[in-house]
């Protein structure tokens, strides 16, 4: 089962992605052997995957400018069948991200231009039954989250601000949160499920029922950019009614993005899901 109307809330910006062997020492030159430009930001990445799965999804988050980069983002939403009616347009430069991907697929991000942005008020965005929020937007919507209807399934991608509000599912890298903090969030009932992910180690699903270890397929990571977003997008799209299968699908989505740098199709997700092992830890 999927949700009927999904809102992907968070960062909206063009990405400039540079593939390099490694970052130089301070003061050195960065030489890239390949680059690409794409519509990015967590809200965009999640919505792009969900729309690709044929589901109804919209975006909201930071304002964008009426400049060339803003036009580029809108054109992408139109071409991807993503609802953008809630986006705020302001007289400022559209924020951007420069992403440096090393030979191991790990990324270093420079984000710019968010200081001038306004953010959507969640109270003004209605008629969604599933909400995906990213860690960067939390400072601007923290109070709004506390008033979101309990009928809305909330997925958070990433962890930065302390969680003092109720969410259903947290998808987070092991680098962003430790197990002690994850267990606290579960025990104090701020979060129902936490999926701790890693690019090269087994993932963990933590809940009040215990811990499950998830062994992903042996994919070589070529670009981890957007892999966590694809994982969160799957949970935000399909929820936890069929928990084990949906967690497998979420992990498969992330693995496909990291290993191929392509949008995961439902057919490919099903194929890769069969290679994922889940067992009690």
Q: Predicted regions: what is each one?
A:
Residues 53, 80, 92-95:
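Short, basic and Ser/Thr-rich N-terminal targeting/leader segments
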Residues 56-85:
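A glycine-rich beta-to-alpha transition motif near the start of alpha/beta enzyme domains, typified by
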Residues 1-60, 261:
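Glycine-rich phosphate/adenosyl-contacting loop at the front of the ribokinase-like
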Residues 30-40, 212-226, 243:
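Short pre-catalytic strand/loop immediately N-terminal to key active-site residues, enriched for Gly-Thr
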């Amino acid at each position: 089962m999927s949700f009927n109307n999904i809102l992907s809330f968070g960062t909206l910006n063009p990405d400039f992605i540079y593939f390099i062997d490694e970052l130089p020492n301070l003061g050195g030159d960065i030489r890239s052997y390949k680059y690409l430009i794409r519509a990015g930001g967590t809200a965009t990445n999640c919505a792009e995957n969900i729309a690709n799965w044929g589901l109804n999804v919209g975006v909201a988050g930071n304002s964008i400018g009426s400049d060339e980069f803003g036009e580029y983002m809108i054109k992408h939403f139109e071409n991807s069948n993503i609802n953008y009616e809630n986006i705020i347009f302001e007289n400022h430069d559209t924020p951007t991200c420069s992403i440096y991907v090393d030979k191991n697929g790990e990324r270093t991000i420079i984000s710019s231009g968010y200081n001038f942005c306004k953010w959507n008020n969640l109270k003004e965005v209605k008629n969604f039954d599933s909400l995906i929020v990213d860690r960067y937007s939390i400072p601007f919507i923290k109070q709004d989250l506390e008033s979101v209807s309990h009928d809305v399934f909330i997925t958070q991608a990433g962890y930065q601000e302390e969680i003092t509000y109720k969410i259903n599912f947290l998808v987070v890298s092991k680098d962003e949160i430790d197990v002690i903090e994850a267990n606290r969030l579960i025990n104090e009932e701020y979060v129902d499920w936490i999926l701790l992910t890693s690019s090269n180690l087994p993932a963990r699903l933590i809940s009040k029922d215990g811990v499950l270890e998830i062994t992903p397929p042996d994919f070589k990571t070529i670009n981890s950019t957007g892999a966590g977003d694809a994982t969160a997008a799957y949970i935000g799209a399909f929820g936890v009614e069929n928990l084990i299968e949906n967690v497998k699908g979420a992990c498969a989505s992330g693995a496909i993005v990291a290993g191929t740098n392509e949008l995961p199709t439902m057919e490919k997700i099903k194929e890769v899901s069969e290679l994922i092992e889940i067992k009690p830890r």
